[in-house]
Amino acid sequence: AMKVNNYLKLSEPYSGETTVYHYLELLRDVVGFDKLKEKVVNPFKGKKIAAYYGCLLLRPSKALAMDDPENPAIMEDFIKAIGGTPVIYAQRNECCGGYITMEDKAQAAKRSGAVMDSAKDQGADMVITACPLCLYNLRKNSGSDLPVYYFTELLAEALGLKEANNE
């Protein structure tokens, strides 16, 4: 409590002018997907990658203003930048079951299973997400054998920072 109180007594007033970026926004708006593409050493050529947005990444859209919540493109643009082929599928913006997994695993399994089935039906080789809870639900509750990765895992492979598993 003493540490917190000391921070609260800062002499400089906080005016709320700090811009906070999601890592995907940083890659798109600060680094630039074109510049990222130039740095790729292990492209995901021939890989069909389904982006899973879920229900929290883009909402509330007025507060986050990252992308169109109904028809987003930021992760598909990321997939193109790392050399993959984006897969568009019906369930990419739907809820995976979220926190309901704590109370009703069957409902979470139904929701996450629908997401994975939808991606697989469109020919996806893998799914990426930007939400840790979605990652958990899609991996543990969906019952699917389709691999699911956090988008930064593919970024690390594409940039040669992690052993490539994209062949």
Predicted regions and their residues:
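Iron-sulfur cluster-binding electron-transfer modules in prokaryotic oxidoreductases
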Residues: 1-167
